[in-house]
Amino acid sequence: MAEPRQEFDVMEDHAQGDYTLQDQEGDMDPGLKESPLQTPADDGSEEPGSETSDAKSTPTAEDATAPLVDEGAPGEQAAAQAPAEIPEGTAAEEAGIGDTSNLEDQAAGHVTQARMVSKGKDGTGPDDKKTKGADGKPGTKIATPRGAAPPGQKGQANATRIPAKTTPTPKTSPATMQVQKKPPPAGAKSERGESGKSGDRSGYSSPGSPGTPGSRSRTPSLPTPPTREPKKVAVVRTPPKSPSAAKSRLQAAPGPMPDLKNVKSKIGSTENLKHQPGGGKVQIINKKLDLSNVQSKCGSKDNIKHVPGGGSVQIVYKPVDLSKVTSKCGSLGNIHHKPGGGQVEVKSEKLDFKDRVQSKIGSLDNITHVPGGGNKKIETHKLTFRENAKAKTDHGAEIVYKSPVVSGDTSPRHLSNVSSTGSIDMVDSPQLATLADEVSASLAKQGL
């Protein structure tokens, strides 16, 4: 109970600041400026006495939707005063919208209300606040002992507001409203403000539990006499519920809200929400390498103190002792020998071959011999068979031989002469002449 109590103290201070501003500006024309806490039907906030009594009373369906209106900005409340509060079931006269002539009465009533709030803060006890909250509660919404709703819920509740009352509210006649809202004399402003509140709000009793909706009185009460003693009305009170239960009722009123606790993303990223990537845990450790036990591939470190043998070779220069050296052929042993060839004398004597030399065949002896074959002569005689040839048979033709040797005499020779009586003259027969020429030519080719 300590935490809701602290919230109500803050809300009382907030409401007191609004009323003091209204008290300072009460002389202004009420038609030009309307405070966000102008009428009881326009604003959900109440005097500190009514707030404390409502904090102790049972939260109903009206209380569940009340923070969505009360905790808004004053500019939003002023903009949504006339169209938002009419569906609550209150009459136009109670809301202060129907008659423009009632604005002055309402402004005067609010000035007295602000002054009564300051007096209640100074001297009145909690009993007076309780009864005032119980008597003067119209069909408006009171702040519940819950914290301020988030802006998302505020806009949602303003958009989808549901009338909380199920039974129609009784309308007061215009005559009674004028009688109740007549401005009293200046001396009795405080009593008139208290009586006006109780008269306007006496048509409603304090909301009971949800199970007893018939406990509300629907008959408007007459204006109370101007006395300071508050009128006590029996109030059925139940222990206040936890904020979680009220929050569940608040969510059930505008409509079913989606269950956002079981929502999963498409790729299941909420399941791995606490997962940290392994790349961030990689530590680059800089360790010095221990090279004391490192061995080379070829084992060169084992032989690091080895001195190569080539470097230890010393070139010693020793003079060669040639005293005992002997040649291969023993020339030094015979170094003093003189060759005998040097003493040989070449003598040249002219030989007399003619006197001593004889030929093998004794040619010189027979030098004057004349061979006998030298006296023989080879005679060559030309055979003249053609010239002397005769035909075996005497056919009466004269054979004319023409020698192949060109001679000056081109006339054919008559080989034979036939008697004039039976002879054939070659001149007279040219065919025989050509035949004889052909035969002689063929014989000449054969070499005959």
Swiss-Prot record:
Q: Which cell locations does it reside in? A: Cytoplasm, Cytosol; Cell membrane; Cytoplasm, Cytoskeleton; Cell projection, Axon
Q: Quote the biased-composition stretches of kind Low complexity, using this chain's numbering.
A: 71-89, 163-176, 201-221
Q: Where is this cross-link: Glycyl lysine isopeptide (Lys-Gly) (interchain with G-Cter in ubiquitin)?
A: 33, 261, 266, 274, 288, 305, 318, 324, 328, 338, 350, 354, 360, 376, 382, 392
Q: Please name the InterPro entries in this protein's record.
A: MAP2/MAP4/Tau, MAP_tubulin-bd_rpt, Tau
Q: Name one GO molecular function term.
A: microtubule binding
List N6-methyllysine occurrences by residue: K266
**Topology of the protein relative to the lipid bilayer:** Peripheral membrane protein
Residue list for modification N-acetylalanine: A2
Question: Which residues does this entry mark as bearing Phosphotyrosine?
Answer: Y19, Y204, Y401
Compositional bias (Basic and acidic residues): 1-16, 119-135, 189-200
Which residues does this entry mark as bearing N6,N6-dimethyllysine? K154, K318
Protein name, UniProt field? Microtubule-associated protein tau
Q: What is the lineage of its organism?
A: Eukaryota, Metazoa, Chordata, Craniata, Vertebrata
Instruction: Give the encoding gene's name.
Output: MAPT
